[in-house]
Amino acid sequence: MIGTDTLQGMALELQVEMSHYRHQFGVRRNDFLVEAMSYGMSEEEARACAIQRIGPVVPVTSMPTLALGKSRPLSPMLAARYQYAGDWKDIHEHLLLPNEVLRIAATEQFRSWISDMRNYWVESAPYRFGDDRLSLLSVASEKEGHFSMLVWREPGEEPEVWTYASQHEYRFRHLLHWFKWLNGRSEE
C-alpha cells in the first residue's frame, strides 16, 4: 500500500501531467492533422476530429464499476483527476464522467466487447477480473474496442489502468503513469 504522503505527492505530480497534456494539445493536433491527411482524410475532416473540449469540474465522489449498481470510492489520484476537469475530449481520447461510464457500460456494443475479451483474450482485464473490479476510464473508439479500464485490485489502493487499442494491451500501475504515457514519457 502506498503511504499518504507519497499519494499526495503523486496526486500533485498527476496535476502537472494533466496540465502538460492539456497544454500540449496544439502539438498533438498538428501531428494528428499531418498523419490523418497522409492516410487520405481531407484537411476539413481532420480538423473536425482534432478538437479538445474540457468540461467544467463537477462533483464526483465515486466511480461506477461494470457491476450494475456498484461503485468504488475515488482514490486520491482519481479525486485529483475529477478536481482538475470534468468531461474531457482530446482528439480521439475521451476521459469519461461517471454518468458517461454508466451509459457506455450498458450498451450492447460494450457488453459484447467485454464478453469477447473474457472469451478470447486470456489475461485481459475482463478475463481476470469480475465486473465489480472494473471501471471504464476513457474511450478512444467504441466501435473499434479502444478502451482504458480501471482495475481495482485491493480496497484502498490506487486502481491500475489497462488500455486496449487494436490488438495491444498497455498496463499502468496507476493514473499518473497512464498520463505520463499519454504525454510520451512512460515509465512502464
Residue spans for each PLM region:
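Short intrinsically disordered terminal tails
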Residues: M1, E187-E188
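A surface-exposed partner-binding patch
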Residues: M1-E144
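Short linear proline/tyrosine/threonine-rich motifs used for host-factor recruitment
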Residues: A46, P159-V161
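Short, low-complexity intrinsically disordered segments
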Residues: G86, R111, N119, L150, ...
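A short, compositionally biased
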Residues: L134, P155-E158
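Glycine-centered tight beta-turn/hairpin loop motif at sheet-sheet or coil-to-beta transitions
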Residues: K143-H146, Q167-H168
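Short, surface-exposed beta-strand/loop micro-motifs that present aromatic residues
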Residues: H146-R153
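Compact, glycine/acidic-enriched structural inserts
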Residues: T163, Q167-E187
